[in-house]
Amino acid sequence: MERVLSNTQMRAADAYTVKVQGQSAQTLMARAGAAIADEVEKIMKKHGFKSAVVVCGSGNNGGDGYVCAESLKNRGIAVSVYAVAEPTSEECILARKACTAEFTHEINADLIVDCIFGTGLCRDIGGKFAEAVNAVNASGAYVVSADIPSGLNGDNGLIQGCAVKADLTLVIAEYKLGHFLNDGLDLCGKTVKKDIGIICPQTTYAEIYSDDDLKPFFIGRKRNSHKGTYGSANIIAGSSEYLGAAALACGAALKSGCGYVKLTTAEMVKLSLVPVYPQVIFSDGIDFNSHSIAIGMGCGVSKDLYNKIIYILENYEGALIIDADGLNALSE
């Protein structure tokens, strides 16, 4: 399980680490830049890349880039810096002054490190910043984004004007909501989290689970067992308009390990489902003896569906999933 923070929560974690834990913002930037350089060095060795350019913005994400460039230079890697704009944050100003890497006016290298904007971006990108983003995307180079692809909103994963499409995103400290929402799923590429010592004081946050987190819930079946050993589910799904919804729902229930899957649906849906999942049992009504009930998928919004959901809510004590048209019916 990994924490997933909003932009506000991440800023609070940064402030807590600086003010309460006594770590300076410059120290955190030094760690972030070094962590980015570590990963860039690995990638360059793996792919045989000969050159890198770090594209730096004017804020702290740009500061991370200057530190990264200096670290790569000290390791003997051919690296240059493309400064999109003059530094504006105190930490970025100091990082640029300390950077002795060569500066360039071209975004052209085997590998590009995107340090233009981080999660602090609160406007659509335009002007020279948009030109830099578009140049990165048009370069054909391997692109590594620091924390989040520039131009991607850290809260909702939407593009703000334009955005970098990364091959790899090095997530600093904690994952952000934008990594997993909307355009973030297409722009982040592979994600790798880098711990730089930022402390998260929040106790309430979103979470994301990996395959390893979920494996304990999918136990192997014992030989001395039968379908009834592994629970039952009643799926109320599908209609003449949405034949496939029932198949998708039943398939998901079976893949979860459910022993008995009972489907309540229209006659034509039954005929289409038998060749796909012959083990599914058909039921004409609601089975309140099932361990779980799922309702709404492809049913079509109707008063009848609404009444069924209310009836189940009032009379059923097992696990209940209301999805798709079920939610739409309740909202009307």
Feature annotation, model-predicted:
Residues 1-83, 179-324, 328-332:
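Small-residue (G/A/S/T)-rich helix-start motifs and N-terminal tracts that mark the onset
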Residues 96-99, 160-164, 187-188, 277-282:
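Short, hinge-like loop/turn segments at secondary-structure boundaries
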Residues 38-116, 124-146, 316-318:
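Nucleotide and nucleotide-moiety/phosphate-recognizing core
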Residues 110-111, 116-205:
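Internal gly/pro-rich beta-alpha loop/helix module
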